[in-house]
Regions:
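Membrane-interface amphipathic/re-entrant loop segments adjacent to transmembrane helices
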Residues: 86, 135-148, 152, 252-253
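Juxtamembrane membrane-interface segments at transmembrane alpha-helix termini
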Residues: 42-52, 101-107, 127-134, 203, ...
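Membrane-embedded alpha-helical segments of multi-pass membrane proteins
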Residues: 25-47, 88-99, 160-168, 208-216
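Transmembrane signal-anchor hairpin modules in multi-pass inner-membrane enzymes, especially those
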Residues: 1-82, 109-119, 175-186, 225
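Aromatic-anchored transmembrane helix interface
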Residues: 63-72, 82-106, 122, 126
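Alpha-helical transmembrane segments of multi-pass inner-membrane proteins
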Residues: 16-17, 75-76, 93-96, 112-142, ...
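Flexible juxtamembrane loops connecting transmembrane helices in multi-pass membrane enzymes
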Residues: 149, 239-253
Length: 253
């Protein structure tokens, strides 16, 4: 029975990974199902505590404490603002999902499959956003007033910029620190170009105040030369950005 639940848990984990950048509804449903499966396993083995001990052995102590702190902060926010009840429930579900994911994705092969699903989700999202940009280019291209059309997919523009920034950090990490073939490097570079383009046409502040500092940190770890190249790319590249993007940048400060 345990094996069947573990197998089902891994399948749901893959679905969860595929939905991260593509569907909030499926993400919430699969995340809740993961928690339910984890709860069932804990209850079935409540006396022997085998599942609980396995979970503790697989979780990094410091990271687990970090997630528990996030849960505590969420409760504090809820106490201050009672109107955020629904939002709090979603946040708690997302934070707690970390633990069943750690339990069900417990081998190198499973990790690779989950990362593949996560990457596929990001690629689908970027391509969909590109299609939306092409379809609505005339609206995006308007420069009158201070209301700017922002490209997004499946969520509000601010949240989308945030998740794509996180996805891009993963892609840069693979490029900088993982051993990859020439074809894989080309694919990663193409994804980086597409991701940066989507972040720019999204016209959100996230690309400037979150993504760039995080990327600068990765470059600093990689080498001083990489960090210098990033700074030059930002300074020089900004001068060549279209007016439609530069105008949005003036509202960041």
């Amino acid at each position: 029975m345990y094996r069947k639940i573990e197998k089902l848990g891994f399948i749901v984990s893959i679905i969860f990974g595929l939905s991260i950048f593509t569907s909030k509804a499926i993400q919430n449903l699969s995340g809740s199902l993961l928690l339910l499966l984890m709860f069932i396993m804990l209850m079935m083995n409540v006396k022997e505590k085998k599942v609980w001990n396995n979970l503790k052995s697989k979780c990094d102590k410091e990271i687990s404490i970090g997630f528990l702190v996030l849960l505590l902060l969420t409760f504090i926010v809820f106490i201050i603002n009672f109107d955020g009840k629904t939002s709090m429930a979603r946040d708690i579900t997302r934070y707690l999902t970390f633990f069943p994911l750690i339990y069900f994705i417990d081998t190198e092969d499973k990790i690779k499959k989950f990362l593949t699903a996560l990457g596929a989700s990001g690629v689908i999202s970027l391509l969909a956003a590109l299609g939306i940009f092409i379809k609505n280019y005339n609206v995006w291209n308007r420069t009158d007033g201070i209301v700017f059309y922002r490209v997004t997919f499946g969520m509000d523009s601010l949240a989308y910029a945030g998740v794509i920034s996180i996805f891009m950090i993963f892609i840069f990490s693979f490029l900088f620190f993982m051993k990859t073939t020439t074809k894989e490097k080309i694919l990663l570079v193409l994804l980086i170009c597409l991701g940066i383009f989507i972040l720019l046409v999204n016209r959100g502040k996230t690309a400037y105040v979150s993504f760039i500092p995080a990327l600068a940190y990765l470059c600093m770890i990689k080498s001083k030369k990489a960090l210098l190249m990033l700074l030059l790319a930002c300074l020089v590249g900004f001068q060549f950005l279209p007016t439609q993007i530069k105008q949005r940048a003036t509202y960041i400060v």
